[in-house]
Every structure is written in C-alpha cells, then in structure tokens.
Amino acid sequence: MHMVGPLMTNQTLATITKRIIERSAASRSDYLARMEQMRGQGPLRGSLSCSNLAHGFAACSEQDKQTLKLTESANIGIINAYNDMLSAHQPLESYPALVKAAAHSVGCTAQVAGGVPAMCDGVTQGTAGMELSLFSRDIIAGATAISLSHNMFDAALCLGVCDKIVPGLLIGALSFGHLPVAFAPAGPMTSGLSNKEKAAVRQAYAEGKVGRDALLEAESAAYHGEGTCTFYGTANSNQMLMEVMGLHIPGAAFEPPGTQLRDQLTRAATERLCKICLLYTSPS
C-alpha cells in the first residue's frame, strides 16, 4: 500500500497564520479571560433579580415559567434571520416552534432571543441597496449580541444561511463565547431550469429575439423555490464552512427544505445543544 506522507502547509498561509496569532495575542488573551469570567458566573438567569426574571419569561407558558424559575435545565436562545425576501431564509419561519418542541422533549426550554436583518445580493444587485450589503454584517453581529445580552440563556441556536448573515451571527455569538452555539440552516433549493437553458434565453433577450416576459419566465424557472441558490455561491459555501467548523449537525448543509430529514436535523441541533450544556438533565 502506498503511504502518503504528512500534509505540508502552504508556506505563505503558515506565515500569515503566524502573524495573525502574534498580532492578536493580547486581544485574544483579554477575550479568553472575559469568557472565563462569564463562564464562572454560572447560569446568569439565576442571578437576575425577580423583576428581571419575571420580565424575561412573562410571555412563556406556565410550564416553561416553572422550568425557567430553576437553573437545572438549559434554556436555548434562538436568533432568527427569517424573512420572505431570501429564499434560503423563508423556511426559517417555522423553525422556532420546532426548536421549542425539541427542547421540551429533553426537559429543556427555548425562547426566541431576537431577530436579525438579512438581505439578498440577488435582489439588490445593480441598485443602491447593494451598497448596504457588506455593512449589514456588522448590524447582524450587533443584533445577535444584543439578543443574547438578556442573560436568560445557557446556549444559542442561530438560524441563518447566506453570506453576511452567517458571519454576522457568528461574530455576534462570539460575544458570548462561553455559551454552546450551533447553527441550523434551511437547505438548498431543488434544481430548476439548467444554466445552459437560462443562458440561452438571456442571449436571445440581449439580441432582441424574446421579450422581458420570456426572460422573467426563464429566471423564475431557474430560481424557483425556497432554499439556497441553485449555484455554488457564498450561501452554499457558508454552509460547508459551518459544517467543517462543527457548528452544524453533520450533513445539515445540503438537505432540502420541507423534508422529514430536514426537520430531524434541526431537532438534533437543538437536542445536541441541550446535551452539551453543563446544566443538561434528562426528563424523568
């Protein structure tokens, strides 16, 4: 059998990585110290005043209120990037109810901690709205941190898919890096009109051989339903990165929306968060 030797890191990449480590040493040390301090405080909702805690679970069911009064079971904070503008995010509308049910099944609770904006380059390209695209990442990061700042949560589940949204969610969640965090995506759009066929219609339109109605029909047939883009763009590469980083349940990136397996993966992400919380207790 032919044995492959150890993999060699590209020297340029190794040099850049070393430089980043050196430049960030002080700030990383401060960050880790801050996270360790936050971790040492234990369940933060247990140290909230009665008035604070009552506000935090006022809208919950009586059963959840009783659970949240204690600090023996995990409470998952859901950060949701749902809207109807992004095909990849539209399926997230139903996720909070699914997550709450999954948490209940293992004796825990879940609350929607907050929502974050999400914009699609596919909608805004060629318009002034595109100028906000990259800036939106910082808004998303801030909104994520604000959502978790209620100090009611033992873990966080981030619901988001596309570029700017996933990095923003991750950056914001790292402000609470002592908490377990997982991501749950919506999955890819099913295949529609092929790129070759779509390109042919675009060419015909450019030549004046077909009208706008035919062009729109072709574009709609190619990009036709819920889920991530039907091409290997940054929405899909973000999902691969989340899975490689261990922030997804394995296999979660490319299961289409609306399937039983898709729901099972979302439930599994919730249950996994509950299990890795130090507070996890099995239901009796």
Feature locations, PLM:
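Conserved small/polar residues in nucleotide/adenosyl-binding loops
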Residues: Y280-S284
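Gly-rich Lys/Arg/Thr-decorated short loops/hinges at beta-loop-alpha junctions or inter-strand turns
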Residues: M35-Q37, G42, I76-N83, A118-M130, ...
